[in-house]
């Protein structure tokens, strides 16, 4: 039984899942929206929301925390340029997931996750 086991495993090991989340977060910050599977979009959404909440206040500590999650200085700089101005007065709800329908090859449910 999976009682009290939070989060989705996505059929990957811990390291692979962590790298997947990091890459999805970097791509989302750089491109403002990405097309991925619905399961991946739902899994990475809370991570991105927490990262943007950290980036709302531009302090050295917040930058270090964001860099530890992103591991990309360019993405971190970009996040800290738009997050305080865009999301300064908003408490959560920074992303939107839109369903796109099944993928042609394998029928996986696709989704568009974007920064609002």
Swiss-Prot record:
What GO molecular function annotations does the UniProt record carry, in alphabetical order?
structural constituent of ribosome
Superkingdom assignment:
Bacteria
Matching entries from Gene3D superfamilies are given as: Ribosomal protein L17
Q: Which GO terms describe its biological process?
A: translation
InterPro entries recorded for this chain? Ribosomal_bL17, Ribosomal_bL17_sf
Pfam families, from UniProt?
Ribosomal_L17 (PF01196)
Identify one Gene Ontology CC term for this UniProt entry: cytosolic large ribosomal subunit
- Which terms are listed as keywords in the entry? Ribonucleoprotein, Ribosomal protein
Question: Matching HAMAP family, A to Z?
Answer: Ribosomal_bL17
Q: What PANTHER family does this protein map onto?
A: LARGE RIBOSOMAL SUBUNIT PROTEIN BL17M, RIBOSOMAL PROTEIN L17
The UniProt entry's sequence similarity note says:
Belongs to the bacterial ribosomal protein bL17 family.
Query: What is annotated about its quaternary structure and interactions?
Result: Part of the 50S ribosomal subunit. Contacts protein L32.
Please give the name of this protein.
Large ribosomal subunit protein bL17
Q: Which organism is it from?
A: Chloroflexus aurantiacus (strain ATCC 29366 / DSM 635 / J-10-fl)
Q: Which gene encodes it?
A: rplQ
């Amino acid at each position: 039984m999976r009682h009290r086991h939070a989060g989705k495993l996505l059929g990957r090991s811990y390291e692979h899942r962590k790298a997947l989340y990091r890459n999805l977060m970097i791509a989302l910050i750089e491109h403002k929206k990405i097309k991925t599977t619905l399961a991946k979009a739902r899994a990475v959404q809370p991570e991105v929301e927490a990262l943007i909440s950290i980036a709302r206040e531009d302090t050295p500590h917040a930058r270090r925390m964001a860099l530890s999650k992103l591991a990309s200085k360019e993405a971190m700089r970009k996040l800290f340029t738009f997050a305080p101005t865009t999301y300064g007065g908003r408490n959560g709800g920074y992303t939107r997931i839109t369903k796109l329908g099944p993928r042609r090859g394998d029928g996986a449910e696709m989704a568009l996750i974007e920064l609002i």
